[in-house]
Amino acid sequence: MFQSILFLAFYGRPVFGSAAARDYACVNTAESRDCWKDGFNIETDYYGKEEAPEGKLVEYELTLSQQIISPDGYEMLGMVVNGQYPGPTIEADWGDTLRITVKNNFTENYNGTAVHWHGIRQKETNWLDGVPGVTQCPITPGDSQVYEFRVTQYGTSWYHSHYSLQYSNGAYGPIVIHGPSSANWDVDLGPWLLSDWYHDDAFALDHVGITTNRAAIPKSSLINGKGYYECDPTNDAKCTGTRDYYEVVLKQGTKYKFGIINTSTILTYTFWIDGHNFTIIAIDFVPIEPLTVDTLNVGIGQRYEIIIETNPDFDDDSSFWMHAQYCFINQTDIVDDKVGIVRYESAGSSDPPYINKSDYHLNFGCADPKPESLVPILKQQVGAQANPLAAEDYFRVGLGNFTWPDATNSTGSVFLWFLQKLPLYVNWSEPSVKKLTIDETADFPPNSRPIELDYETGQWVYFVIESDWDPAGAVDQYGQEIRVEPSVHPFHLHGHDFLILAQGLGKFTSDIQPNLDNPPRRDTVDVEPLGYVWIAFQIDNPGAWLFHCHIAFHSSDGIAIQFLEQPSKLKPIMEEAGVLGDFADRCNKWDDWYQAVNIPHNATQADSGV
């Protein structure tokens, strides 16, 4: 469990983090969490490349492999990091440099791999974003790759494999970058990874899904790799009988901070703790004005830093359930909503009393907190739109029958999702960064879904994502009418935070007015079932950046595009960094491996690749 960490730091009120404005006068304590050190604080403009404190080098080694695990008391062959699920916490301070060596030990299933550092902008280090087929070729089994980058943001996040569905089998862990907070707290409880869990291999489940158009239903929900699945060990050898809810013990009169991360495969969760309110102080990597709520939706990939204060009205032997239910109305009992226990320090070990869910929780829906309630501390104004945005440019989510373009994939016609016309399909051996820097070609196949953003640094681009639109006349690859299915879609952008100009239910129409004055800013947003989101971000980070639904099955089945941002600027950046040689070597090694091992063993790419 994390303990409170006190940093000797100084405080100023800089204008865009200007060193001249810093007075170095404040210390980071339980009474001044908005301070950090060396004049850096909650108001520092962390989007400037140099706007982070001087830091140290922090090194980690992560080995990805397979082993039998039973986080909810039922055994399955999972994917682990350093022999554990979830993987170990990557922990650093704002301004540190992380050097992480990732080793691929998937020697039995012939899987490549790559690790994505979710929410880390990778400013001018696009090739370290960890997306096979987009920013790199996969790491071959038995090989390793070093990811080294400076962390200029702070808060709570996670790392995960971005190779097909590996993270759904367990290949992920938390990231904590310590920095200032927008409200005071006493003790840091660390990251809480909230996840749905299956008892079958995610790759196999997805194959069933795309051939039958039936989504796989999770078996249980977990916090930090702990959960409770009801089974009988006398009748099922895989039922180990060792299962536990995640528990925390709190002390009266104390403010606790924790970061909640939805690391699920399919479920957006509605989260609450019986008898308690909590205060949101950050969304993704963005500190906000404190917002007190009693219930919170957490989409896949979203993070919230939260403060919970123990209730003086409760006895010190009280205990309470933590709840996480599927957000979709009328399907809230898809898994048991009890996911953990909060105990006050003198409470025993018995289960808390169960409080029946009210209509408030049953009908809470899948919406993010109201946009007007999420006010970033560091203010940003949205500039004028540089890109064309007619209705035909909207990113519309649909479902249809398609065939994967890879000749080695023999699945034939399958049910695939798409974002604007075609499902994404990347070539692991020919990632976009390779095309832009080594091959220097604009030959991007249609299914690689490239959208070029060749604008000047500082300009703004706007995009609309719709899940409620009229598909009349739109047909799939086999001439069947496209379907619009009511599903929540948590969309994640790599390489940027975006600003949310508007968000809601129903169709997006031209009379909707954008909020351009310091709107909510984050990297993952929920598009409600049959809803829309209007976003904008600033051109300032050359590279190939994935934008995708973070329901793992949806991303695997095609809901993604990639932005090619200032493509001509990427090669000079990589040449200056001296990384093109290693990049090419990794692709050559992967291509040789894939041709010599994967294809003969029928272990070929069977989905979008991401």
From Swiss-Prot:
UniProt KW Signal keyword: yes
Effect of loss of the gene: Abolishes the production of pestheic acid and RES-1214-1, but accumulates isosulochrin and chloroisosulochrin.
Domain of life: Eukaryota
Signal peptide (from-to): 1-20
Alphabetically ordered keywords of this record: Copper, Glycoprotein, Metal-binding, Oxidoreductase, Repeat, Signal
SUPFAM superfamilies, per the entry: Cupredoxins
EC number, as in UniProt: 1.-.-.-
Enzyme class (EC, first level): oxidoreductase
Sugar-bearing residue positions: 105, 111, 262, 277, 330, 356, 401, 409, 427, 602
Every Plastocyanin-like domain range: 67-181, 191-344, 425-568
Recorded family membership: Belongs to the multicopper oxidase family.
Main function: Oxidoreductase; part of the gene cluster that mediates the biosynthesis of pestheic acid, a diphenyl ether which is a biosynthetic precursor of the unique chloropupukeananes. The biosynthesis initiates from condensation of acetate and malonate units catalyzed by the non-reducing PKS ptaA. As the ptaA protein is TE/CLC domain-deficient, hydrolysis and Claisen cyclization of the polyketide could be catalyzed by ptaB containing a beta-lactamase domain.
UniProt-recorded name of the protein: Oxidoreductase ptaE
Native source species: Pestalotiopsis fici (strain W106-1 / CGMCC3.15140)
